[in-house]
Amino acid sequence: MRAVELEVTGKPAFAGYCHCRDCQAWSAAPINAFSLWPSASVRITKGEAEIATFHKTENSYRKYCKICGGHLMTDHPRMRLIDVYANLLQGFVHEPTLHANYGSKMVSVKDGLPKYRDLPAELGGSGEVLPD
C-alpha cells in the first residue's frame, strides 16, 4: 500500500531520459526516466499531507514522501510542467522520445533516440543534438 498516490490525465508533454548531474544525484542513478506533464494534468489522489518539498532552485521543487522518502515528482513552475517519475504511474507505458542533458552522461546509450546536449529548444535548451 502506498502512502501517496497520484494520477495524470492526457499524455505527457515530453517523455525521455535525463542525464543531468542533478537527476543523477537525486535518483542515485546514471539516468532518470522522466515524464513531463502539464501542471493541470497531475493530481494527488491520496496522501497529500505526506508530501514534503525540497526547493532545489526557484525553478525546481522536488516532492518526496515523508513516510518512506521515495521520490515522487519535481515541479518546474517556470515551464508549467511537472516531472512525474515514470515508474510511479501504474498502468503508464513509458515511451521515451529523447535523451536530455546527454552532454553530462555517465553511460552511453545506443537506442536511436535524439540525444540533446542539454535540452530541446522547446524546453529552453540549445536544441543541439549529439551523435548516438
Can you name each region flagged by the protein language model?
Residues 3-132:
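A short Gly-Trp-Pro
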